[in-house]
């Protein structure tokens, strides 16, 4: 049952609020650290770790942590291992439907775990507002995910990969997802390393993303394109008013901070 992940009481567990540590770890540098932009503090730090960023004690119960790990994060970890085995020197790869479904489930979970989304679900007058805060988080993380999945969100999108061939690294917003216009339609990115992003393209652009059943990879060789994508990622996280933007290298975060500071 959906509510099996929810129990009463407060667990003293250090939870990753939204983005799991296994994804953040992929943005570590050679020192096993990551640079990060702190949205609330408006500063760039250089000694972040996957274990410490985006965490809070007691945010989820231990049972919900186990549920998310087993149902969402472990399957997605297997997809990441599969992606790491792909030959990106080719311009297309075969991706099975289970892989695509797992990626969507992970994206749905990221949306449901967004603290802003959770806060909106638990506003005054909603029955959730009468529950302890941890139970609210548990409920929305599980049932919000199920509702998003049931409604077929993103079902009109096809999975492809963006391969960053430039020296400018992709940045990871802790929210995970960001959207932008691609050939007149909305596209959605989820960076999984400084050089690879999962990309959902609307099915009306199927000729761009698929050829004879194989997924066409979208290679980026123009640094300006990567910087534009990073700007969308940075902007999306800042709009949430909380969280971090992560990168193995500081210079790109400094550039983005300067860009957005000049607009405020």
Named regions from a protein language model:
Residues 1-264:
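Alpha-helical structural context detector biased toward long hydrophobic helices
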């Amino acid at each position: 049952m959906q509510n099996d992940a929810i129990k009463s009481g407060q667990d003293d567990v250090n939870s990753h609020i939204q983005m799991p540590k296994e994804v953040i770890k992929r943005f570590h540098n050679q020192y096993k650290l990551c640079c990060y932009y702190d949205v609330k503090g408006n500063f760039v730090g250089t000694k972040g770790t996957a274990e410490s960023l985006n965490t809070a004690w007691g945010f989820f119960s231990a049972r919900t942590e186990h549920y998310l790990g087993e149902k969402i994060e472990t399957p997605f970890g297997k997809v990441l291992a599969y992606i790491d085995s792909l030959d990106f020197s080719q311009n297309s790869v075969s991706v099975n439907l289970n892989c695509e479904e797992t990626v969507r489930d992970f994206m749905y979970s990221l949306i449901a775990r967004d603290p802003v989304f959770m806060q909106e679900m638990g506003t005054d007058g909603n029955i959730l507002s009468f529950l302890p805060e941890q139970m609210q988080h548990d409920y929305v993380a599980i049932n919000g995910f199920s509702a998003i999945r049931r409604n077929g969100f993103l079902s009109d999108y096809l999975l492809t990969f963006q391969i960053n061939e430039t020296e400018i690294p992709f940045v990871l917003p802790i929210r995970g997802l960001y959207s932008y216009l691609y050939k007149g339609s909305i596209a959605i990115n989820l960076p999984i390393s400084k050089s690879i992003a999962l990309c959902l393209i609307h099915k009306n652009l199927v000729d761009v993303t698929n050829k004879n059943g194989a997924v066409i990879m979208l290679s980026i060789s123009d640094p300006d394109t990567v910087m534009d994508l990073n700007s969308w990622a940075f902007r999306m996280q800042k709009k949430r008013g909380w969280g971090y933007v992560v990168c193995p290298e500081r210079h790109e975060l400094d550039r983005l901070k300067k860009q957005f500071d000049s607009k405020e």
